[in-house]
């Protein structure tokens, strides 16, 4: 199954807020609940919705998500917590959380077009796993800095998680440590994803 490129608001109406997918929000006061069945939710449906939230928020394919669940299952700590840490330490997600891109798909495009450096080296793989003390910068040309400049200026520094720091003048971000569960940008029950 490939990456989702269809209408994003349909997914937000179905699954709830997905800040990594889009900044748009559905119209308030519309009859969204009447369109979908509002009866008793089955356990399978609940687990599937949690899995789909995770997939669409981080922009993963089914195969990528299964690979991350498999890696997290081998860890000695809680599988759900390790899964979220793996997903949050992806380069495209860190760019989004730093405020260098408006959405995760936008951050993926910055990485794919070779505008981003990690520790002074060009990285063009959005799923690159960042480690503590990694320094994330833009290329030293005007075009790369211009792409990131508008997003950094409009981002809210109060929403920056504790495991990241950003220098807005030099367009430089730093990964301080591995993320805690309480700073994940998505409201999700990761245990249901692992059970699915």
Swiss-Prot record:
Gene Ontology BP, a term: ribosomal small subunit biogenesis
UniProt-recorded name of the protein: Small ribosomal subunit protein uS4c
Pfam families listed in its UniProt record: Ribosomal_S4, S4
Domain S4 RNA-binding as annotated: residue spans: 89-157
Gene Ontology molecular function, alphabetical: rRNA binding; structural constituent of ribosome
Alphabetized InterPro entries for the sequence: Ribosomal_uS4, Ribosomal_uS4_bac-type, Ribosomal_uS4_CS, Ribosomal_uS4_N, S4_RNA-bd, S4_RNA-bd_sf
Location, primary (coarse class): plastid
Lineage of origin: Eukaryota, Viridiplantae, Streptophyta, Embryophyta, Tracheophyta
CDD domains in the cross-refs: S4
Subunit structure: Part of the 30S ribosomal subunit. Contacts protein S5. The interaction surface between S4 and S5 is involved in control of translational fidelity.
Region described as Disordered: spans on this chain: 17-36
Family: Belongs to the universal ribosomal protein uS4 family.
């Amino acid at each position: 199954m490939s990456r989702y490129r269809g209408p994003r608001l349909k997914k937000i109406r179905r699954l709830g807020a997905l800040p990594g997918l889009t900044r748009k929000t559905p119209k308030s006061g519309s009859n969204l609940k009447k369109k979908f069945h509002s009866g008793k939710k089955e356990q399978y449906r609940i687990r599937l919705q949690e899995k789909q939230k995770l997939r669409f928020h981080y922009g993963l394919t089914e195969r990528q998500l299964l690979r991350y669940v498999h890696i997290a299952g081998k860890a000695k700590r809680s599988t759900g917590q390790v899964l979220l840490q793996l997903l949050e330490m992806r380069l495209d997600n860190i760019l989004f959380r730093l405020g260098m891109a408006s959405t995760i798909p936008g951050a993926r495009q910055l990485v794919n077009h070779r505008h981003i450096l990690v520790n002074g080296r060009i990285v063009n793989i959005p799923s690159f796993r960042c480690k503590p003390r990694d320094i994330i910068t833009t290329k030293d040309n005007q075009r790369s800095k211009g792409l990131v400049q508008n997003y950094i200026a409009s981002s809210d520094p109060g929403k920056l998680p504790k495991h990241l720091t950003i220098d807005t003048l030099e367009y430089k971000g730093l990964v301080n440590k591995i993320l805690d569960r309480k700073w994940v940008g998505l409201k999700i029950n990761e245990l249901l994803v692992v059970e699915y």
